């Protein structure tokens, strides 16, 4: 059994968390390769190291004194080092880092949280330190060079029986540091798992896996013990944020299960993510997730269905503004484009004006204040009446549905409702498919 074991920011936030990590790693000999994030928040009011590094970079760019920021960063790392009794000369490394800020770019600066954390963890565990910049290779288009990366990872594994690896970054062919999106440490772990064809990719965080609904809305929602990659993609896209959604792809390509576990409660079962799951699931649905902050643009044109390329012409205008489209529900004479408010804050009316002037529809209507809620489940297609049950429950609870979208694989039913109905909608769906089914 060979595992890649990744610990998120909350799992390495201070010396106490480091001790938990050591206990977890040493309890299983197959946890040979460890990936770490930068230290996260110790309390709700605390700062993540990565946030502080972005702030430090902003001070650098605008030539503002950053001594207060560097002191906080220094104190965080040195408190971990000193409390654990580590011997490395971290003070010297930090001094050199802060002294060379003017020569560094943003990616180099913000990646140092993972870098210093991994160096501390390597000494604490007695493992080798392997720098991600020497292993993960980006192409110039910012995609992963899998051939080069796989060779480098396998060479490091051949050299070291155990190592600690910083997440979140790699380098390009010119040796320049390149980062993943925020939360990208999860991607780093998945890349290592793919490159060595690991038996399992463990992702340790501060929650015991995925829940069927947001616990801020639904009281004590059921745990999801098993979920498919596809289901997780659907839920992650709609806001279920335990694992970075792009971490799924490298593991999925080699059919490597991902196990979400809780550093603070290592005895909990967590959630296992895999390609397919045998047997009957306890409920018709797997989970519910959603997001607020959407606008729909309704385009109506009589006999639209007879006009070749009509929808494409509208979409090409939207594409000109580089706006991602969430859904395109349609009928014979009309269709709607659902987009995130954040993507059209300053361009919505200009874009709508172009649609009116260039495409000449009978009318265009915009509606803001829309929320999207997705109900996801791999077995929904095998249970006739699932969508009717969902719509009926919302109707009987006086929730008006503005939009409906269902994937062709019948794994996901998405409804659009008023933002003020968001919490109520999630609760009603949960009660319909989970609470009532338990009785």
Task: Give residue ranges: language-model regions.
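Nucleotide/pyrophosphate-binding catalytic subdomain
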Residues: 1-243, 248, 416-418, 437
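Structural motif
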Residues: 2-3, 31-34, 108, 127-128, ...
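Flexible loop/turn segments at secondary-structure boundaries
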Residues: 12, 42-43, 137, 171-173, ...
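Terminal amphipathic helices with adjacent charged low-complexity linkers/tails
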Residues: 36-55, 211, 260-277, 332, ...
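Acidic/polar loop patches that form or flank catalytic/metal-binding clefts of enzymes
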Residues: 244, 255-262
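A conserved regulatory-domain signal marking ACT and ACT-like small-molecule sensing domains
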Residues: 269-439
């Amino acid at each position: 059994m060979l595992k890649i074991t990744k610990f998120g920011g909350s799992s390495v936030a201070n010396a106490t968390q480091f001790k938990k990590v050591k206990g977890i790693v040493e309890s299983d000999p197959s946890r040979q390769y460890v990936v770490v994030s930068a230290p996260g928040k110790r309390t709700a009011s605390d700062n993540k190291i990565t946030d502080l590094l972005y702030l430090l970079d902003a001070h650098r760019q605008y030539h503002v004194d950053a001594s207060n920021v560097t002191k906080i960063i220094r104190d965080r790392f040195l408190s971990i080092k000193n409390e654990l009794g580590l011997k490395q000369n971290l003070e010297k490394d930090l001094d050199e880092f802060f002294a060379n800020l003017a020569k560094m770019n943003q990616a180099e600066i913000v990646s140092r949280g993972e870098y210093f954390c991994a160096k501390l963890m390597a000494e604490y565990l007695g493992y080798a330190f392997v720098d991600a910049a020497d292993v993960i290779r980006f192409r110039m288009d910012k995609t992963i060079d899998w051939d080069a990366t796989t060779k480098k990872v396998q060479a490091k594994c051949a050299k070291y029986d155990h190592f600690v690896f910083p997440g979140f970054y790699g380098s390009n062919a010119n040796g320049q540091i390149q980062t993943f999106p925020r939360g990208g440490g999860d991607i780093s772990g998945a890349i290592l798992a793919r490159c060595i064809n690991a038996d399992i990719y463990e992702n340790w965080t501060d929650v015991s896996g995925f829940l069927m609904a947001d616990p801020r809305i639904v009281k004590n929602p059921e745990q999801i013990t098993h979920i498919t990659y596809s289901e997780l993609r659907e839920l992650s896209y709609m806001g279920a944020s335990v694992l970075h959604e792009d971490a799924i792809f490298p593991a999925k390509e080699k059919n490597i299960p991902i196990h979400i576990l809780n550093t603070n409660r290592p005895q909990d079962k967590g959630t296992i993510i895999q390609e397919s799951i045998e047997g009957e699931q306890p409920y018709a649905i797997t989970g519910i997730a959603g997001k607020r902050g959407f606008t729909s643009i309704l385009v109506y044109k009589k006999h639209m269905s007879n006009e070749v390329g009509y929808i494409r012409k509208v979409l090409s205008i939207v594409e000109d503004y580089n706006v991602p489209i969430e859904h395109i529900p349609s009928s014979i004479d009309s269709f709607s484009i659902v987009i995130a408010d954040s993507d059209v804050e300053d361009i919505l009316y200009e874009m709508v004006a172009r649609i009116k002037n260039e495409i000449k529809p009978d009318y265009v209507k915009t509606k803001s204040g829309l929320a999207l809620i997705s109900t996801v489940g791999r077995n929904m297609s095998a249970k006739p009446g699932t969508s009717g049950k969902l719509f009926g429950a919302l109707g009987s609870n006086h929730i008006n549905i503005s939009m409906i979208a269902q994937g062709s694989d019948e794994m996901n039913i998405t409804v659009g409702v008023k933002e003020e109905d968001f919490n109520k909608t999630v609760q009603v769906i949960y009660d319909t498919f989970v609470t009532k089914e338990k009785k």
